[in-house]
Amino acid sequence: MSCSFFTGEEMNKRNYQKELEKIIEENQKAGRVPRLFLHSCCAPCSSYVLEYLSQYFQITDFFYNPNISPKEEYDKRTRELQRLIEEMPFLHKPEFVEGRYDPQEFFQMAKGLEEVPEGGERCFKCYRLRLEEAAKMAARGGYDYFTTTLTISPLKNAQKLNEIGEELEKIYHVKHLPSDFKKKNGYKRSTELSREYGLYRQDYCGCVFSKRERERQKAEGKTCG
């Protein structure tokens, strides 16, 4: 099985990066530094996103990822993100908030989808699980926007993530910040920052299914680099 990448040009008819830049420009012209509730999946993906957005937003960085297992892996990723926020210089220092960790939330969501290939419906439901919790928390806290770091990954479907975010905006009445953070060399910059800060870079997304798929690819000599 070959690796599937969502580079943007093939999947996205809208340019979410340009939409984000327009929002940033409008807020800057108005002299606003909006409050952003940012769902973070891991330190490497968050590195560039935090570097970029902290120039324009006051960020609460929300680590809610019940998909990650085992617990030791979850703890390791949590610590790395906390360390990154402590060590990186920021114009507006992000606040770190850890969500609850209950893997049963993920397994209940994935029920019946255990054999669906990576990048399919199970992943889309996982996107929604995490984004919905972020939207709820953002609405409860009176934030101006919510979004996720997930769109930085070449393995994640940015169009689907933005569509889910826009659906949740209508439900929870808090603005979704459009993004495709892999654009403008965002993913490349995240790898540079990961090296600079010596970040732990995991080789699977987080769930048992992605771990199993990664191990199968390794055994067959098929890796995504």
Predicted segments with their positions:
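Nucleotide-activated chemistry modules centered on ATP-dependent adenylation/adenylyltransferase
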Residues: S2-G225
